[in-house]
Amino acid sequence: MKILVTLLGWVVAGGLCAAEPAAVRPPTGVAPEFTRTIYLVRHGNYDEAAKGDDEVVRGLTPLGMAQARLVAARLRGMPVMFTSLNASTMTRARQTAGVVNQALPGLQLQITPLLRECTPPTWRADIMKDQTPAGLAAAEAQLNAAFARFFVPAEGSDQHDILVCHGNVIRYFVTKALGVDTRAWLGFSVAHCSLTIIQVDAHGGYKVLAVGDAGHIPPNLLSGLGRAAVAPRVMP
């Protein structure tokens, strides 16, 4: 009995129960690795019937403004520190980005033609018949240049970048990140003001985290998927 009591006293006072796990330290001499996470926002619903320059007309409809406010609130609620906000030069993208910028006023909105809507090569014959070889080549060159500019490893710290652009642009970027034939970009759709998230690791590898996530938009406010709304639209 005396031996048992002595043993228990040792365990409680300074033995097994009192022992702290050893701190786990990263190996010395190993450089930290950072990631870049890119949040691709498709613009909101817009006036497709308007005629004229896309940088002047074809602005957001009331539905599109409501969608923009919803995605802005989604972004504002994320537990990350956003580091940049870029948008296409087209009116509908600039207006959507402006709403996002109001929700995230610490960011400086940058406008770039690299994110403009365009039509790159696709397997769809019905789409290709209306395009010229020069136009297709220009679109592909633009999107490849945009991908090379924005989808690069982070330096110094984790980066969280928002790109407000267009459906064709976003889908092309997804095919590039997945390493599949970029002509497959018409094989899926992304809703207006949906979120597509792609991460770039320290070695230049890509991981697609989300495609066309529209969970922040009620079903009756969804658009841009090529189908009718499931319920009458009521502005929030």
Indicate residue ranges for each PLM-predicted region:
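Active-site metal-binding loops of divalent metal-dependent hydrolases
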Residues: 44, 167, 214
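Bacterial N-terminal signal peptides
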Residues: 5-15
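Glycine-rich phosphate-binding loop signature in dinucleotide/nucleotide-binding domains
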Residues: 78-80, 152-159
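Active-site signature of alpha/beta-hydrolase-fold catalytic machinery across serine-
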Residues: 99, 172, 176
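Generic beta-sheet signal
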Residues: 38, 157-165
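Acidic, low-complexity terminal tails and accessory targeting/binding regions
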Residues: 17-35, 117-128, 157, 176-236
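Active-site-proximal alpha-helix that buttresses catalytic centers in soluble enzyme cores
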Residues: 20-112, 131-136, 140-145, 226, ...
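GST superfamily/GST-like fold recognition
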Residues: 169-171, 207
